[in-house]
């Protein structure tokens, strides 16, 4: 799969021990913030994302800073939809806003790069809803399948992913791209963490 090969070749999928936003320790890390450095695969990923959401009824896109903003921006331009973004915490200067958009009365597509437990996504949903918007769906490039879909479901928000981590890792586990030791660490993590 070109996407997965590109992730590995460009060091966007890293193998090791990484602390995630959720606090979990993972034997792999997806650094999709840099995917836009590789236009061809980035553009292909955006096209696949658009294909996944083409039947969703929304009128504004909100990207989660920072990983979701490049994807949200390209999708917004290609689909002709207004764009805003949301931070996970106040910046402490300027207007000190968390949400940079007028979402009142709008149906929102929330966009991020990766979903793990759904903590950041659900926080964004709460903020957008409190500002009068309604998140109708959330799009991520990769769902790590560690609870985000269930968490968003509690808010009535559907999680849509371009890729599931299971398909990415299964490809890796059946390839010669990583060592046997790394394969074993990933298998162990999958058993313990993937829904």
Swiss-Prot record:
Catalysed reaction(s) here are: orotidine 5'-phosphate + diphosphate = orotate + 5-phospho-alpha-D-ribose 1-diphosphate
| Parts forming coiled coils | none
Q: Which residues bind orotate?
A: 116, 144
SUPFAM superfamilies reported in the protein's UniProt record: PRTase-like
Which residues participate in 5-phospho-alpha-D-ribose 1-diphosphate binding?
A: 87, 91, 112-120
Q: By its UniProt entry, which InterPro entries does this protein fall under?
A: OPRT, Or_phspho_trans_dom, PRibTrfase_dom, PRTase-like
GO MF annotation: an example: orotate phosphoribosyltransferase activity
- NCBIfam families the UniProt entry points to: pyrE
- The protein in question is named Orotate phosphoribosyltransferase
Q: Which organism is it from?
A: Sulfurisphaera tokodaii (strain DSM 16993 / JCM 10545 / NBRC 100140 / 7)
């Amino acid at each position: 799969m070109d996407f997965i090969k590109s992730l590995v070749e460009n060091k966007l999928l890293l193998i090791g021990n990484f602390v995630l936003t959720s606090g979990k320790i993972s034997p792999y890390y997806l650094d999709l913030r840099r995917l836009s450095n590789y236009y061809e695969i980035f553009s292909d990923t955006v096209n696949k994302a658009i294909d996944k959401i083409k039947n969703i009824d929304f009128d504004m896109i909100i990207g989660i800073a920072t990983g979701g903003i490049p994807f949200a921006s390209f999708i917004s331009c290609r689909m002709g939809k207004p764009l805003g973004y949301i931070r996970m915490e106040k910046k402490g200067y300027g207007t000190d806003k968390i949400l940079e958009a007028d979402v009142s009365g709008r149906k929102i597509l929330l966009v991020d790069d990766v979903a793990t437990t759904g903590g950041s996504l659900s926080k964004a949903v709460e903020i957008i809803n409190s500002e009068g918007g309604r998140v109708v769906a959330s799009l991520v490039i990769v769902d790590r399948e560690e609870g985000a879909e269930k968490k968003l479901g509690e808010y009535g928000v559907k999680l849509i992913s371009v890729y599931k981590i299971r398909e990415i890792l299964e490809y890796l586990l059946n390839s010669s791209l990583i060592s046997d030791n790394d394969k074993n660490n990933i298998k162990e993590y999958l058993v313990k963490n993937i829904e």
